[in-house]
Each structure stands twice: as structure tokens, then as C-alpha cells.
């Protein structure tokens, strides 16, 4: 039971780190788009 909880927590933290990475990537892309639009 405790091991299962640990596995769930590990999975959740891994998912969270992946989501954070994706959000960072999307944020940098949208900033590049904003700059590109602003420069035109």
C-alpha cells in the first residue's frame, strides 16, 4: 500500500516535470511569435 502510494507520487512528479517542460517550450515559442509579429 505504501509502495503503491510512492509509485503514484513518483508518477505524478514525473508528469508534472514533463508538463512544466512542455509549458516552458510553448512559452518560448509564443514569445518568439510575439516578437516576430511586433517586428513586422
Swiss-Prot record:
Residues 11-30 are annotated as: N-terminal region. GO terms for molecular function: channel activity; toxin activity. It comes from the Eukaryota. The keyword Lyase does not apply. One of its GO terms (biological process) is cytolysis in another organism. Its main location: secreted. Residues 3-12 are annotated as: Plays an important role in the hemolytic activity. It is found in: Secreted; Nematocyst; Target cell membrane. Pore-forming protein that forms cations-selective hydrophilic pores of around 1 nm and causes cytolysis. Pore formation is a multi-step process that involves specific recognition of membrane sphingomyelin (but neither cholesterol nor phosphatidylcholine) using aromatic rich region and adjacent phosphocholine (POC) binding site, firm binding to the membrane (mainly driven by hydrophobic interactions) accompanied by the transfer of the N-terminal region to the lipid-water interface and finally pore formation after oligomerization of monomers. This toxin shows hemolytic activities. Belongs to the actinoporin family. Sea anemone subfamily. This is Cytolysin EnT. It comes from Entacmaea quadricolor.
Amino acid at each position: 500500500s505504501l509502495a503503491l502510494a510512492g509509485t503514484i507520487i513518483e508518477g505524478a512528479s514525473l508528469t508534472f516535470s514533463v508538463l512544466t517542460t512542455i509549458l516552458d517550450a510553448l512559452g518560448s515559442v509564443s514569445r518568439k511569435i510575439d516578437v516576430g509579429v511586433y517586428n513586422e
